[in-house]
A protein has these predicted regions:
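Nucleic-acid endonuclease domains
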Residues: 1-171
């Protein structure tokens, strides 16, 4: 049981909040309450991409894309928390269940504090031709391996997302 008052969360930076959240997730996992530590990753990555690219988040009902770029580009966002070096399985993204987007932005966040480790924008045709359909997940699976993240047609967005993340730290 928590004694006294809970900490003043408003006093924490965003990375400080994520570090605290990570510690909570680790404890819940050690107790068998949860099985993974990826809970807030997708929402946070979508938020960062929308902020960094000056876009807007898709309505919750939209299934094919997550962010509408300021140029009308439909972007699917996939994210994972990774340790350094990445452990087996950490690079497998959630399945693509449709390809109704123009590009996918793949975001890898540090397990320590959710800082952006790597981010790449990959054209849909590259994702579609590389992802492998898996019936048991009813979708196409892609791994955020170097050959995808550094694909000749991919755009490295690491610095752009880090700048958006850094700008949010001062809020």
């Amino acid at each position: 049981m928590l004694s006294g008052q809970p900490p003043d969360l408003a006093a924490f930076s965003e990375s400080g909040l994520f570090s605290l959240y990570r510690a909570i997730l680790r404890e819940l996992k050690s107790r068998g309450v949860i099985r993974t530590e990826n809970a807030p990753v997708g929402d946070y990555a979508e938020y960062l991409v929308a902020t960094a690219l000056g876009g807007r988040l898709a309505p919750n009902a939209e299934k094919a894309w997550d962010v509408l770029g300021n140029d009308g580009e439909k972007i699917q966002v996939k994210a994972r928390v990774v340790s350094g070096p990445a452990e087996p399985g950490q690079l497998q993204l959630s399945p693509f269940r449709s390809f109704g987007f123009d590009a996918a932005v793949i975001v890898l966040l540090s397990a320590a504090d959710y800082a952006v480790s790597r981010a790449s924008k990959v054209p849909r045709h590259v994702v579609e031709s590389t992802a492998v359909y898996r019936q048991h997940v009813n979708g196409s699976v892609l791994f955020a391996r170097p050959e995808i993240m550094g694909h000749p047609e991919a755009t490295d967005l690491t610095a752009t997302l880090r700048a958006a993340q850094s700008g949010r730290e001062n809020v």
